[in-house]
A protein has these predicted regions:
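Short acidic, glycine/serine/threonine-rich loops at helix termini
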Residues: 51-54, 60, 76-82, 113-115, ...
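A glycine- and small-aliphatic-rich helix-loop capping segment at beta-alpha/alpha-beta transitions
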Residues: 57-61, 81-90, 159-163
C-alpha cells in the first residue's frame, strides 16, 4: 500500500499511466481473439456497463437490449435498466431506459420451466421473444452476468453460455458479459 501511495495520490482513467498500459497489454494478451483488442478502463462497473451499452447501440445501430432477471449491473440510468435483483434499486427512478426486456436466468434451484433443461428452456424463451415481441433484428446486445451475484450466486447450466453465444452470433447480436 505504501509503495502504491508513493506512486499515486489519485487515479482516474482520464490520463494514461504506466500501470494502466501494462494492464491493457496483459488483458489483450489473454483475450481469445485473433485480432487487435482495445481496452476501456474506467472508474466503476456501472461505468463499464454504460460504455458497453453505448458501444453496442453505436456499432449495431439497433435500439433494444435483453437482460436477465435477478441481475445487478449498477445504479446509473442505463445500467439500472438491467438491474433486476431487487426493486429497491429502481424505486423512485422510473421510467428507466426504454428498450430493455428481461428474461429468466436459468436457475437450477428455482426452475421456472418445470421438468425442462433450464438452459435450453431459457434459450427457447429468447427465440420465442424474437418471433413474437422483440425482433432479433432490433436487439443490439444481450447482457448477462456469467455468475449471477445478487440473484443468488448462480452458475448457469453447462453449455448455456455457449448456446447464448451461438444465438447472438446467429442474429448479429453482441453479447456483453458483466462480471
Amino acid at each position: 500500500v505504501k509503495d502504491a501511495a508513493e506512486q499515486f495520490l489519485h487515479i482516474s482513467s482520464d490520463y494514461w499511466h504506466e500501470n494502466m498500459v501494462a494492464l491493457a497489454e496483459r488483458l489483450a494478451a489473454l483475450a481469445p481473439m485473433g485480432e487487435p483488442v482495445m481496452s476501456f478502463l474506467c472508474q466503476s462497473g456501472t461505468e463499464s456497463v454504460e460504455g458497453a451499452l453505448k458501444l453496442a447501440r453505436y456499432v449495431t445501430g439497433r435500439p433494444r437490449f435483453i437482460g436477465f432477471l435477478g441481475g445487478f449491473h449498477g445504479r446509473t440510468m442505463g445500467s439500472l435498466s438491467f438491474t433486476s435483483s431487487k426493486y429497491t434499486q429502481q424505486k423512485g427512478f422510473a421510467p428507466t431506459m426504454p428498450g430493455v426486456t428481461h428474461v429468466p436466468y436459468p436457475n437450477p434451484y428455482r426452475p421456472l420451466f418445470a421438468g425442462a433443461d433450464q438452459g435450453k428452456a431459457v434459450l427457447d424463451y429468447i427465440r420465442m421473444l424474437f418471433e413474437r415481441n422483440v425482433p432479433a433484428s432490433e436487439v443490439a446486445a444481450i447482457m448477462i452476468e456469467p455468475l449471477q451475484g445478487e440473484g443468488g450466486y448462480l452458475w448457469p447450466p453447462e453449455g448455456f453460455l455457449a448456446g447464448l453465444r451461438a444465438l447472438c452470433d446467429e442474429h448479429g447480436i453482441l453479447l456483453i458479459f458483466d462480471e
